[in-house]
Amino acid sequence: MSEQDSWTALDSDYRLNHAIRIILVGAESTRTTTLAEALVTHYRAMFPGIRNVEEYGRQFTYDLLEQAATDAAAAGEPEPGMDDLVWTPEHFAIIAREQTALEDAAALAAPLVVADTDALATLLWERRYLDGTSGSELYAGALLPRRDLYLVTDHVGVPFEADEIRDGEHLRADMTRWFTEILGARGYSWVLVTGSREKRLADAIALIEPLLEGVPEASLKVRQPGDQ
């Protein structure tokens, strides 16, 4: 039996509760996705089933912007931009719920999860865009899966790279502070990763390696010739 089969043969509740979950969060354009993808690539030889847990909110924003453009065109109005989008608590509830679903699917597939953001980060983005009742708090609190480590990507020394939905260069320092404050307040283990891409990757691997001692031995064995 291969190491991948040994993990997926385990009970689903066991996998959800025992997968090592590494969550990457950070302000806009702080190389969070870059680091997440590099970690997945690094660990794929050990865990062939490891998945890229991408940022659901980004695709949701593109879809919302596309729908707003369609509605504006039908009404004969100018094409809207990010500042024209109308966000609701329900939007953030959907984003938080779907982000957790992606994370859990990755936990069922492999004993190591590397997630590019999570429902707790969604809560902070909701704080940025909305005041009042939160739609994502339930998913960021009571329904948030167990975490092993948060990696917060620092904004310092990272140039801001704009795209059609990034609009928060002026808020990056505040967002970094919000992340570290809420992680500390809620008692999560977290580390601020800084420096070059290479340094961030090396530091992240050094932090993750000791956590892998908790992975079932059968899931860590090296694939041998003839394994089925």
For the regions a protein language model found, what residue spans apply to each?
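Extreme N-terminal, non-catalytic leader segments
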Residues: 1-21
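C-terminal accessory extensions appended to soluble enzyme cores
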Residues: 2-9, 214-228
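Glycine-rich phosphate-binding P-loop
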Residues: 24-39
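Conserved substrate/cofactor phosphate-moiety recognition/catalytic segment
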Residues: 40-98
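Hydrophobic "anchor" residues on beta-strands that sit immediately upstream
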Residues: 50-51, 112-114, 150
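Active-site flanking residues adjacent to catalytic metal/cofactor-binding acidic residues
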Residues: 54, 115-117, 153
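Glycine-rich phosphate-binding loop used to anchor ATP phosphates in small-molecule kinases
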Residues: 88-145
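A glycine- and Lys/Arg-enriched "phosphate-lid" helix/loop adjacent to the NTP-binding pocket
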Residues: 129-198, 212, 219-223
